[in-house]
Amino acid sequence: FLRAISLNPDSVSFRWDFSINQLSKVYLTYDDIKKSLHGFEVELTKLQEFITAERLDEAAEVVGKSQPYYLAYFEIDNKFLLEKYGEICCRVMKHWQEKNLIAPVNSITKRNAGGKIKVGIVSAHIRYHSVWNAFLKGVVKNLDSEKFEVHIFALNDKVDNETELAKTTAKYFNAGERGLAQWANKIRNSEIDIAFYP
Protein backbone atom coordinates (compact mmCIF):
# COMPACT_ATOMS: atom_id res chain seq x y z
CA PHE A 1 0.00 0.00 0.00
CA LEU A 2 2.89 2.37 0.62
CA ARG A 3 3.90 2.06 -3.04
CA ALA A 4 0.32 2.72 -4.13
CA ILE A 5 0.13 5.75 -1.82
CA SER A 6 3.43 7.08 -3.18
CA LEU A 7 2.03 6.81 -6.73
CA ASN A 8 -1.33 8.33 -5.81
CA PRO A 9 -0.95 10.25 -2.53
CA ASP A 10 -4.47 11.72 -2.74
CA SER A 11 -6.24 8.34 -2.82
CA VAL A 12 -8.56 7.88 0.14
CA SER A 13 -8.99 4.23 -0.83
CA PHE A 14 -5.27 3.41 -0.57
CA ARG A 15 -4.93 5.18 2.77
CA TRP A 16 -8.07 3.50 4.11
CA ASP A 17 -6.78 0.06 3.17
CA PHE A 18 -3.33 0.82 4.56
CA SER A 19 -4.91 1.77 7.91
CA ILE A 20 -6.96 -1.42 8.09
CA ASN A 21 -4.04 -3.57 7.04
CA GLN A 22 -2.10 -2.62 10.15
CA LEU A 23 -4.08 -5.49 11.67
CA SER A 24 -2.75 -8.93 10.78
CA LYS A 25 -4.50 -12.29 10.98
CA VAL A 26 -1.72 -13.99 12.95
CA TYR A 27 0.80 -12.79 15.54
CA LEU A 28 3.80 -14.58 16.96
CA THR A 29 4.23 -12.52 20.12
CA TYR A 30 2.26 -10.21 22.35
CA ASP A 31 4.63 -7.41 21.33
CA ASP A 32 3.58 -7.95 17.71
CA ILE A 33 -0.04 -7.47 18.77
CA LYS A 34 0.75 -4.24 20.63
CA LYS A 35 2.77 -2.94 17.68
CA SER A 36 -0.09 -3.74 15.30
CA LEU A 37 -2.70 -2.04 17.47
CA HIS A 38 -0.49 1.02 17.88
CA GLY A 39 0.06 1.15 14.11
CA PHE A 40 -3.68 0.91 13.53
CA GLU A 41 -4.34 3.76 15.96
CA VAL A 42 -1.66 5.96 14.36
CA GLU A 43 -2.95 5.29 10.85
CA LEU A 44 -6.57 5.93 11.89
CA THR A 45 -5.51 9.32 13.25
CA LYS A 46 -3.74 10.10 9.97
CA LEU A 47 -6.77 8.91 8.00
CA GLN A 48 -9.09 11.05 10.09
CA GLU A 49 -6.98 14.12 9.32
CA PHE A 50 -6.55 13.14 5.66
CA ILE A 51 -10.30 12.95 5.01
CA THR A 52 -10.92 16.66 4.63
CA ALA A 53 -14.23 18.18 3.50
CA GLU A 54 -12.97 17.95 -0.09
CA ARG A 55 -12.36 14.21 0.24
CA LEU A 56 -15.64 13.21 1.89
CA ASP A 57 -17.29 12.18 -1.39
CA GLU A 58 -14.45 9.81 -2.25
CA ALA A 59 -14.41 8.50 1.31
CA ALA A 60 -18.12 7.62 1.07
CA GLU A 61 -17.25 5.24 -1.77
CA VAL A 62 -14.69 3.49 0.46
CA VAL A 63 -16.61 3.02 3.73
CA GLY A 64 -17.27 -0.67 4.25
CA LYS A 65 -14.83 -1.77 1.54
CA SER A 66 -12.36 -2.99 4.14
CA GLN A 67 -13.13 -3.18 7.83
CA PRO A 68 -11.10 -3.92 10.98
CA TYR A 69 -12.61 -7.41 11.12
CA TYR A 70 -9.72 -9.06 12.96
CA LEU A 71 -9.81 -6.49 15.76
CA ALA A 72 -12.64 -8.46 17.38
CA TYR A 73 -10.33 -11.43 17.86
CA PHE A 74 -7.82 -9.66 20.10
CA GLU A 75 -8.28 -10.51 23.76
CA ILE A 76 -7.74 -6.87 24.63
CA ASP A 77 -10.21 -4.04 25.16
CA ASN A 78 -10.23 -2.36 21.73
CA LYS A 79 -13.29 -0.21 22.28
CA PHE A 80 -11.29 2.98 21.79
CA LEU A 81 -10.03 1.84 18.38
CA LEU A 82 -13.48 0.73 17.25
CA GLU A 83 -14.92 4.07 18.38
CA LYS A 84 -12.24 5.94 16.47
CA TYR A 85 -12.93 3.90 13.33
CA GLY A 86 -16.68 4.37 13.85
CA GLU A 87 -16.31 8.15 14.19
CA ILE A 88 -14.60 8.28 10.80
CA CYS A 89 -17.34 6.18 9.21
CA CYS A 90 -20.10 8.26 10.84
CA ARG A 91 -18.61 11.58 9.70
CA VAL A 92 -18.22 10.35 6.14
CA MET A 93 -21.68 8.81 5.92
CA LYS A 94 -23.35 11.80 7.56
CA HIS A 95 -21.93 13.89 4.73
CA TRP A 96 -23.21 11.33 2.20
CA GLN A 97 -26.66 11.35 3.81
CA GLU A 98 -26.91 15.15 3.77
CA LYS A 99 -25.67 15.35 0.18
CA ASN A 100 -28.15 12.74 -1.02
CA LEU A 101 -31.02 14.40 0.84
CA ILE A 102 -31.94 11.29 2.73
CA ALA A 103 -33.78 12.28 5.87
CA PRO A 104 -32.60 10.63 9.07
CA VAL A 105 -34.67 7.78 10.45
CA ASN A 106 -37.23 9.10 12.90
CA SER A 107 -35.93 8.82 16.43
CA ILE A 108 -39.52 8.49 17.56
CA THR A 109 -41.69 6.69 15.07
CA LYS A 110 -45.40 7.19 14.80
CA ARG A 111 -47.00 4.05 16.12
CA ASN A 112 -50.07 3.45 18.15
CA ALA A 113 -49.66 3.06 21.87
CA GLY A 114 -49.37 -0.64 22.51
CA GLY A 115 -48.48 -1.28 18.87
CA LYS A 116 -45.80 -3.73 17.89
CA ILE A 117 -42.17 -2.63 17.86
CA LYS A 118 -40.80 -2.79 14.31
CA VAL A 119 -37.35 -4.41 14.24
CA GLY A 120 -35.46 -3.91 10.98
CA ILE A 121 -32.70 -6.42 10.25
CA VAL A 122 -30.31 -5.18 7.56
CA SER A 123 -27.85 -7.85 6.45
CA ALA A 124 -26.20 -9.58 3.52
CA HIS A 125 -26.28 -12.83 5.50
CA ILE A 126 -29.92 -13.92 5.40
CA ARG A 127 -28.89 -17.41 4.30
CA TYR A 128 -26.76 -20.33 5.46
CA HIS A 129 -23.86 -18.29 6.83
CA SER A 130 -22.06 -18.07 10.16
CA VAL A 131 -23.83 -14.79 11.04
CA TRP A 132 -27.23 -16.36 10.38
CA ASN A 133 -26.39 -19.68 12.02
CA ALA A 134 -24.70 -18.28 15.13
CA PHE A 135 -27.40 -15.90 16.30
CA LEU A 136 -29.50 -14.16 13.68
CA LYS A 137 -31.70 -17.16 12.93
CA GLY A 138 -32.48 -17.41 16.65
CA VAL A 139 -33.36 -13.73 16.83
CA VAL A 140 -35.69 -13.95 13.83
CA LYS A 141 -37.40 -17.16 15.01
CA ASN A 142 -37.72 -16.28 18.69
CA LEU A 143 -38.80 -12.65 18.83
CA ASP A 144 -42.25 -12.51 20.39
CA SER A 145 -44.58 -11.85 17.45
CA GLU A 146 -47.13 -10.33 19.83
CA LYS A 147 -44.66 -7.55 20.67
CA PHE A 148 -42.35 -7.33 17.64
CA GLU A 149 -42.75 -7.05 13.89
CA VAL A 150 -39.67 -8.21 11.96
CA HIS A 151 -38.66 -6.40 8.76
CA ILE A 152 -35.77 -8.01 6.89
CA PHE A 153 -33.66 -6.17 4.35
CA ALA A 154 -31.46 -8.77 2.62
CA LEU A 155 -28.78 -6.80 0.79
CA ASN A 156 -28.29 -9.31 -2.02
CA ASP A 157 -30.06 -11.94 -4.11
CA LYS A 158 -28.53 -15.02 -2.47
CA VAL A 159 -31.30 -17.46 -1.60
CA ASP A 160 -31.34 -20.85 0.11
CA ASN A 161 -33.59 -22.74 2.54
CA GLU A 162 -32.60 -20.42 5.38
CA THR A 163 -33.64 -17.40 3.29
CA GLU A 164 -37.00 -19.04 2.71
CA LEU A 165 -37.36 -19.57 6.47
CA ALA A 166 -36.63 -15.88 7.03
CA LYS A 167 -39.24 -14.91 4.44
CA THR A 168 -41.94 -16.94 6.18
CA THR A 169 -41.00 -15.63 9.63
CA ALA A 170 -40.69 -11.91 8.86
CA LYS A 171 -43.63 -9.57 8.49
CA TYR A 172 -41.81 -7.84 5.60
CA PHE A 173 -38.95 -9.21 3.52
CA ASN A 174 -37.05 -7.11 0.99
CA ALA A 175 -34.09 -8.45 -0.97
CA GLY A 176 -31.96 -7.62 -3.96
CA GLU A 177 -29.03 -5.73 -5.34
CA ARG A 178 -29.69 -2.00 -4.91
CA GLY A 179 -27.61 1.11 -4.57
CA LEU A 180 -26.94 2.67 -1.20
CA ALA A 181 -29.44 5.50 -1.70
CA GLN A 182 -32.18 3.05 -2.72
CA TRP A 183 -31.62 0.87 0.33
CA ALA A 184 -31.40 3.88 2.64
CA ASN A 185 -34.74 5.20 1.39
CA LYS A 186 -36.43 1.78 1.56
CA ILE A 187 -35.27 1.28 5.14
CA ARG A 188 -36.21 4.80 6.16
CA ASN A 189 -39.65 4.51 4.58
CA SER A 190 -40.35 1.29 6.49
CA GLU A 191 -40.54 3.39 9.69
CA ILE A 192 -38.79 0.75 11.77
CA ASP A 193 -38.23 1.45 15.45
CA ILE A 194 -34.97 -0.48 15.75
CA ALA A 195 -32.29 -1.03 13.10
CA PHE A 196 -30.06 -4.06 13.57
CA TYR A 197 -27.03 -4.55 11.28
CA PRO A 198 -25.52 -8.02 11.76
Where are these regions (language model features)?
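Alpha-helical solenoid repeat scaffolds of the TPR/TPR-like class and their adjacent stem/linker regions
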Residues: F1-P198
